[in-house]
Regions:
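Acidic/His- and Gly-rich active-site-bordering loop/insert found
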Residues: 1-96, 117-121
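Acidic/histidine-rich catalytic neighborhood of metal-dependent amide-processing enzymes
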Residues: 102, 106-158
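Loop-rich non-cytosolic ectodomains and luminal regions
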Residues: 99
Length: 158
C-alpha cells in the first residue's frame, strides 16, 4: 500500500475536472483497483452513474445502508496543466486537489483499507462521488433519491 502522500500524488495527476469525464472515470477506476488490490477481504462494490458522472461505493457489507461512511469527492476545479504535477516542498504537498480534496481522499482511502483489514464487526463504506465541484446533482442526490443510499455516520474532511 502506498503511504498517504504517495497516494495523494497519484490522485493529483488525474485531471478530473468537471466535464472531463474520461479522467473522472480514470481516477474512479484507479481508486477501485487500488482498494481491491490492498484489501485482504472481499468487498461489495457499486458504481452508480448519472449523466456520465460515476459514484464509487465500496463497503464491507452493504453498499446501500452502511453504518459508517468515509466520504471524499474525486473531482477538482479546473487548473493549468502544471497544477496536476504534484510537488512536495518543505514537507508540504502542492498540486490541484491537494487540499480539496485529493489529499483528504488519500487519507480516507488508506484509512478505509486499514480498517477493513482489521476485520471490523460493523459495516463501513467508502463513498466517492465525482461531481462535487459542479453542484453534486449527478452523484450524491442520485445515490440518495434513486439508489436509496443511507448511512448512520459520515466522516467527511472537506
Amino acid at each position: 500500500m502506498l503511504n498517504t502522500i504517495e497516494l495523494a500524488k497519484e490522485l493529483i495527476k488525474f485531471k478530473s475536472t468537471p466535464h472531463n469525464l474520461e479522467e473522472i472515470h480514470n481516477v474512479t477506476k484507479f481508486v477501485l483497483d487500488y482498494v481491491q488490490k490492498h484489501s485482504k477481504t472481499a468487498l461489495q462494490t457499486k458504481i452508480l452513474e448519472k449523466n456520465g458522472y460515476p459514484t464509487l461505493i465500496i463497503a464491507t457489507q452493504s453498499v446501500k445502508k452502511p453504518a459508517l461512511t468515509f466520504y471524499a469527492h474525486l473531482d477538482v476545479v479546473p487548473a493549468k496543466n502544471n497544477d496536476f504535477t504534484p510537488v512536495v516542498k518543505d514537507n508540504k504537498l502542492y498540486g490541484r486537489g491537494s487540499g480539496d480534496m485529493k489529499g483528504p481522499a488519500a487519507s480516507l482511502i488508506n484509512a478505509f483499507i486499514t480498517l477493513v483489514n482489521s476485520n471490523p464487526n460493523y459495516d463501513i463504506c467508502l463513498f466517492l462521488p465525482t461531481d462535487e465541484e459542479s453542484g453534486g446533482h449527478n452523484c450524491c442526490k442520485h445515490a440518495i433519491e434513486t439508489f436509496g443510499f443511507r448511512t448512520k455516520c459520515v466522516i467527511m474532511p472537506d
